[in-house]
């Protein structure tokens, strides 16, 4: 998948500096640092790091936030959208990669503080939520969504 992505970028005339993907694991818990593939200095100093609807799939969302903030420049922004806490759903378990049934504002705030991205922290609930068709069987569930942001300390 990554090779195809990089090939398509190159075919569009984009340089490696403009668009390029690498394979790596930022949240490997078996070591203090991510894989060697992610050690290149060009993979640090970002203006923004985002996770869209994914933190509830990580076994350790706090570690994910830590590792993302490490890659931001001072003043860079961590931006996350995900679900607020909700009850478990029948048949939608860890088999589908759901590790957490939403994240509370308190947990997200503590996560940003721990990661060093608490400056200007805000968490907003977006609209009236999101309706999701689970498993393509017509069973719809509604989830409240939040958008959280914070800046890495200078």
Where do the PLM segments sit?
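Conserved acidic residues
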Residues: 47
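Short catalytic micro-motifs in class I SAM-dependent methyltransferases
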Residues: 53-54
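Class I SAM-dependent methyltransferase SAM/SAH-binding core
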Residues: 1-39
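C-terminal alpha-helical "lid/dimerization" subdomain adjacent to the S-adenosyl-L-methionine
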Residues: 15-16, 77-148
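Short N-terminal helix/helix-N-cap motif within the alpha/beta-hydrolase-1
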Residues: 6, 58-63, 88
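A conserved beta-strand element that flanks and buttresses the S-adenosyl-L-methionine
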Residues: 50
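A short glycine-rich, Lys/Arg-flanked "PGG" loop and its adjoining helix->strand segment in the class I
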Residues: 62-77
């Amino acid at each position: 998948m990554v090779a195809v992505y990089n090939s398509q970028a190159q075919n569009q005339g984009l340089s490696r500096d403009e668009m390029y993907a690498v394979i790596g694991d930022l949240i490997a818990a078996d070591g203090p640092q991510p894989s060697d593939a992610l050690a290149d200095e060009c993979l640090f100093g970002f203006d923004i790091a985002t996770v869209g609807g994914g933190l509830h799939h990580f076994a350790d969302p706090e570690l994910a936030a830590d590792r993302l903030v490490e890659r931001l420049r001072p003043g860079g922004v961590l931006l996350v959208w995900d679900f607020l806490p909700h009850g478990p759903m029948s048949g939608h378990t860890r088999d589908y990669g759901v590790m957490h049934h939403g994240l509370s504002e308190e947990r997200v705030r503590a996560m940003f503080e721990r990661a060093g991205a608490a400056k200007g922290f805000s968490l907003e609930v977006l609209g009236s939520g999101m309706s999701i068709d689970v498993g393509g069987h017509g069973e719809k569930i509604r989830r409240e969504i939040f958008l959280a942001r914070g800046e890495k300390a200078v």
